[in-house]
Amino acid sequence: MVSKPRTEWSTVLSHLVLAGVSLHAAVSSVQSSRGAAAGFLLQTFAAIIMLAPGPSTHEDCLAGAWVATVIGLPLLAFDFHWVNGDRSSANLLLGGGMVLAVAGDHLGPEGCSVAGQAVLLVVAVTILIVAVFTANTYGMWGGTLLGVAGLLSRLEEDRLLLLPKEDVCRWALAAGSWAYCRALHTQRLQWE
């Protein structure tokens, strides 16, 4: 069993910020959107598990982060679509994420990587589309930042802005999650 590699300060900080933003978003959205709160909570656990010392392997942590991506992100988008009356897209996103989570063992490492990035981009684009049509500025920012995180993860470079690429992606994901939490709040205020 290979234990988790040592991490540098930027990696630890990006995980902590993502966990903090996601936990705050989960707590603030639990009353109005349980699906989104569950998605934010999955992101929180995935970020914390990557840092937690213990017997878990790096591969186990990556598998947990992958499941948080393919189930957690569709859960975030589910409520955004559902409240706007787009129930078929909401169900399709969530159902697709569940199928991918179950099929993860059969995809292999490269397949899981592509599937995770595809889910991230699909969720980002669908949030962006709904936000544009409902004039939800936070939703537009959230969708854009989630998309940026997905696109940055596809780059071949190891470092961006003097930081490891994965850290920059986590920062973008944290900013997108914060904006998306605000978008959910704005959306709820519009419908009340």
Curated annotation (Swiss-Prot):
> Which residues, if any, are the signal sequence?
1-32
Main location (coarse class) = membrane
Q: How does it sit in the membrane?
A: Multi-pass membrane protein
**Superkingdom of the organism of origin:** Eukaryota
Task: Tell me which UniProt keywords the record has, alphabetically.
Answer: Membrane, Signal, Transmembrane, Transmembrane helix
Membrane-spanning regions, if any? 35-55, 63-83, 92-112, 114-134
Where does it reside? Answer: Membrane
Transmembrane found in the keyword field: yes
Q: Choose one Gene Ontology CC annotation of this protein and give it.
A: membrane
Query: What is the protein named?
Result: Transmembrane protein 276
